[in-house]
Amino acid sequence: GEVLSLEDEDLIEEADVLITLSNQGYIKRLAQDEFQAQKRGGRGVQGTGVKDDDFVRELVSTSTHDHLLFFTNKGRVYRLKGYEIPEYGRTAKGLPVVNLLKLEENESIQTIINVTKDQVADHYLFFATRQGIVKRTNVNEFSNIRQNGLKALNLKDDDELINVFLTDGQADVIMGTKFGYSVRFAETDVRNMGRTATGVRGIKLREGDHLVGATIVSDDQEVLVLSEKGYGKRTPASEYPRKGRGGKGIITLKVADKNGPLAGLTTVQGNEDIMVITDTGVIIRTSIANISQTGRSTMGVKVMRLDEEAKIMTFALVDAADQKDQEE
């Protein structure tokens, strides 16, 4: 892509836009008014132009002049301004993101973060890796990123980035592992480190275990966990006490043959829908409200029926309103 000079950028109207990235890697920009009209007219998620075997995994509300940071599983970060992502109509599939970003082989976008001008000074990016390593870095360390990306954190060979999220410096973080353990700690337990630092231990993993989810948590939320065999539950976040980082953690899901290992952990308000992807490529959608509220050290209840051999690989939260629109 061409690099616009500042004068050229001034010619681009500052407007609110939505950026969507589909599970199969298609990206596009939608004008906000397209989106609002689409909401009023119903149809919801179908307005995003994705095929049946795909869905919108990242939906970011931003401005044409804001910066978007794209973090990959390999710990690299790429940066685009909102206007650099091509605009498409509602029903168009979009552009393969590899056409915009110089991704390496086996490299995929894990998270997109919108950084507004007023967040640069006092906000942090919090990183969590598969091996339980965490890192916190000031957002302003990511202000000049070349087109072919930058290393956002130093990963060991067998490690990969699981999640990155923006924090205000005062948040609590919760992490969950495949064997069903979790830790919750204040983000300030992780000191601010430079961009190339490796990070510190967030959770002490048992042999063979690895991280499957990490996010910000507060006591007015619920912690949602889902197992590979389709069991799930919601638990009030207050049942997860804040401890220091680096411990072995407490049980977030009793893992047994019946329910299988933990597939993911996130926090919810309770009014969202969830999109679940199995290793056979099936996408199942259900309302969070359908998932029972139970205590922290339980097995959960069957949330969805899976084919005999299928396992849940991952899931994403989506706005529940979309579903209602489709039913009208």
How would you label these PLM feature ranges?
Residues G1-E328:
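Short, structured "edge-of-domain" segments at secondary-structure transitions
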